[in-house]
Amino acid sequence: MIKSNLILIILGISILMGQDTRFIDEVFDDIIITEDVVYGNAPDLPFWFLFEWNTVDIDLDMDIYEPVGDTLDNRPAIIFIHTGAFFSGNNELDDVVDLSITSAKRGYVSFNINYRLGLNILSSYSGERAVYRGMQDASAAIRHIREYHEEYNIDPNKIFIWGSSAGSFIGLHLAYSQDDERPQSTYGTGSDPDLGCIDCSGNSYMQDSKPNALVSCWGAIGDLDWIEPTDNIPTLMFHGTLDPIVPFNSGFPFTIDIALPIVYGSNLIHERL
């Protein structure tokens, strides 16, 4: 009897080990993509600009990837934010599309967002304003998802950001900075408008805009003092030590002292956390 029970236990463990695990393995074969879902509206800059007064309001949209045949409520969500140095890129780039697909097949709901671009590398403050606009758009996306979490079958307490390069800048700044820490440049000058508070753009939903966790791929932050011990946001970072675009420690973006301010990369963020 003891041998029989032992065999049954071993067989049971073998069966369990052979089964795919949701959120780790691709347990769904098919996904459905809902394209161009509008999550907000905000003033956008032209591709070429010197000052920021010449804007046109645009819809902020995203593509939603979901597993077909999923009956689970309160699913975790991942917001993917693309790269592009704040002057190029969109949510059709291969990496964010592939990540959105494979995450949906693992049982997550993927929200692959577009955000406003606009960077003048000859301006000493354009980079700060570009990151801040991206923060506002990511905030609007999170607030939209939390507002409609029942329609999306999303757990509003399990909304994660996965950013790549510029997208990681957005995720890190949204996670760790507060309204009273916004750069002075975001308040505007005679030729550049006040961008408003972090949650004051895109839509009017009164939801919390902080992510519950963050994946940062070769990102950086503008001020290490923004990171507080009480933030308590789980963060996973990937970064090459010889990255020539975003410094692993501290330095200028693109490794060139032009007009953009110094930023602090993943190694120093890790030490601060």
Short names for language-model regions:
Residues 19-73, 204:
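N-terminal cap/lid segment of alpha/beta-hydrolase-fold proteins
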Residues 136, 140-231:
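Primarily recognizes the serine-hydrolase "nucleophile elbow" in alpha/beta-hydrolase
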Residues 85-90, 110, 144:
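Serine-hydrolase catalytic-loop signature spanning alpha/beta hydrolases and amidase-signature enzymes
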Residues 237-239, 243:
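Short beta-strand/loop motif that positions the catalytic acidic residue
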Residues 91-113:
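Short amphipathic alpha-helix adjacent to the substrate-entry channel of hydrolases
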Residues 73-86, 236:
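Short beta-strand element of the alpha/beta-hydrolase
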Residues 1-22:
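Bacterial Sec-dependent N-terminal signal peptides
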Residues 93, 247-273:
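Short alpha-helix in the alpha/beta-hydrolase fold that links the catalytic acid
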